[in-house]
Amino acid sequence: MGNSGSKQHTKHNSKKDDHDGDRKKTLDLPPLTKSDTTHSLKSSRSLRSLRSKRSEASLASNVQAQTQPLSRRSSTLGNGNRNHRRSNNAPITPPNNHYLTSHPSSSRRLSSSSRRSSMGNNNNSELPPSMIQMEPKSPILKNSTSMHSTSSFNSYENALTDDDDDRGDDGGESPSMAKVTRINTSSSADRGSKRTPLRRHNSLQPEKGVTGFSSTSSKLRRRSDNTLPASYPLNAEAGGNGSDYFSNRSNSHASSRKSSFGSTGNTAYSTPLHSPALRKMSSRDNDDSGDNVNGRGTSPIPNLNIDKPSPSASSASKREYLSAYPTLAHRDSSSSLSPRGKGQRSSSSSSSSQRIYVSPPSPTGDFVHGSCADGDNGSRTNTMVEMKRKKPVRPVDIDEIIQRLLDAGYAAKRTKNVCLKNSEIIQICHKARELFLAQPALLELSPSVKIVGDVHGQYADLLRLFTKCGFPPMANYLFLGDYVDRGKQSLETILLLLCYKIKYPENFFLLRGNHECANVTRVYGFYDECKRRCNIKIWKTFVDTFNTLPLAAIVTGKIFCVHGGLSPVLNSMDEIRHVSRPTDVPDFGLINDLLWSDPTDSSNEWEDNERGVSFCYNKVAINKFLNKFGFDLVCRAHMVVEDGYEFFNDRSLVTVFSAPNYCGEFDNWGAVMTVSEGLLCSFELLDPLDSTALKQVMKKGRQERKLANR
């Protein structure tokens, strides 16, 4: 499946042989899921797109195929190029049968109309995929009980954003992305099959010719962030001797945990609750927003009930507290989340017709109306009068927000302003924070699930991905991070993902990537986009939300999913489970490694990363990790790969990258890895499209939505 042999393929495999082989072995092809004709029309870079055009003219030519199991002993798949992968369809069955159960597909590929009909009821048969409403699937989150401590709900402010002036005076231009030399890309006429089942063999002995991520293993392999931004703080060890850095790191797990924001908040990445900086930030945010929501929506202090003030507390102290922390004055209760009297549930068992409302974080109760608990009219302050005069903010309807975001995406126009109000964005972020904190830092999921790699603000490609793989809740999703930066529509991208998280909290999951932190977003585009299209407070609100994201996930106890990779200080999964959130990304330690580390074919088990952050780990480290924790596969993102996915170390690790034509510079494909209930791993691909082709695809989707609205 990897590209290790793509350059070693002999010359006797000519293009003529490829085309003849396609015609002769049509019925033996593995299922090629990259056949969504509505989204492959404009690809002129491969013959596979031409076949997609023919298949659109005659859907009867769609073929039936079996999924072929892969084995770590399959030297043909490990060493052959794409044409080998397409023609090799002999199943190889490793001994671990309970993990390798799969059944060949016996049904022909459905047309677009019948596919839509199967996704919903009769009323949805003519709707485009983005508008189909259906019952959510059963929850796949096993450890749904909250695993974090109560102290995680303490008010938290990010010290890295506290000193930012909301007027944006200190925000400079994002530096251009470093140019990267592409590795001798040859124009292959046909890429071959991109959907193959994953079968992990117990043997850890790699086959001859499997070179993993070596310089000859892929036509294009590049880390999505080759260098660390200059503003990213690093310890002295990062730039010093590698052995000294490792010795410092290997025995510093306790300090790593301390850097990950303990409940006391006395770290370099947090501001204490009663700090003057917090008061200053709160008052400054009230003046610059321009919307109806004050503050940043940090989680309220436990046992604080503003609706029922304590008789012993003086009205003056209450008013002083509210003036300093306006966003802490209200917390949604389970019995009053909707103006219609409906309780908002964080469960996927709710029907699709149930409207989900997110209550605003503005203060409510007697204080909003300016009346004090002691009834003293003369004790009203100017702050209370201002709060009384402000127009109340209505709860947002998540379904309506999702449709507005989809309409904006299919409009294919990058506007200066976002389609949502600032107050709506803040409410969405606040609700998402609550959901992230209510779920563990280490998710344990059941199949089936679709695993998505880096998206990087490529909003149109995200809509193409959902169209191909199914809009929620048609499929369960696990995203591996890096939702913002680089792309031109990071705001729409992260907002749509957060809305789906709110709508389907136990079927839609988001992990944290290395770009979901304050320092990186300041350099690579998201800060500038928020400053240009909203304001700096919106960026701060998103950073606070990023600080609550989970760090890793385990699928059915066999597949370890993370954004970056492994860590030399990870000795137990409980160390990830017990990470206290919210937390920024520390300069070193467990969290830093999970988000920044990379695989390497070096002989050293652990060595310094050329990014300047974290480590690189080789095959030995991967095998030790798998054997220690009983996993069969590590699924990660964090690197650009030409085919959208790439295996390493005899299929014990796979990199998934889901942003096709990354930054408009790399002619790479995007991939989504699907894990079936039988632990069969397959890949669905998105072909790289230029801006003109993307606009035509979005135009077609826009026309379908208009017809459905009529």
From Swiss-Prot:
Compositional bias per record (Basic and acidic residues), positions renumbered to this chain: 15-27
Keyword Lipoprotein: yes
SMART domains (alphabetical): PP2Ac
Sequence positions bearing Phosphothreonine: T161, T271
Keywords: Hydrolase, Lipoprotein, Manganese, Metal-binding, Myristate, Phosphoprotein, Protein phosphatase
Cofactor(s) this protein requires: Mn(2+)
Annotated catalysed reactions: O-phospho-L-seryl-[protein] + H2O = L-seryl-[protein] + phosphate; O-phospho-L-threonyl-[protein] + H2O = L-threonyl-[protein] + phosphate
Compositionally biased tracts (Polar residues): 62-77, 95-104, 261-273, 291-302
Residues modified as Phosphoserine: S55, S71, S203, S224, S275, S310
Residue ranges of the region described as Disordered: 1-382
Positions that bind Mn(2+) 1: D454, H456, D482
One protein family per Pfam: Metallophos
Function: Essential for the maintenance of cell size and integrity in response to osmotic stress.
More info: Present with 189 molecules/cell in log phase SD medium.
Name listed for the protein in its UniProt record: Serine/threonine-protein phosphatase PP-Z2
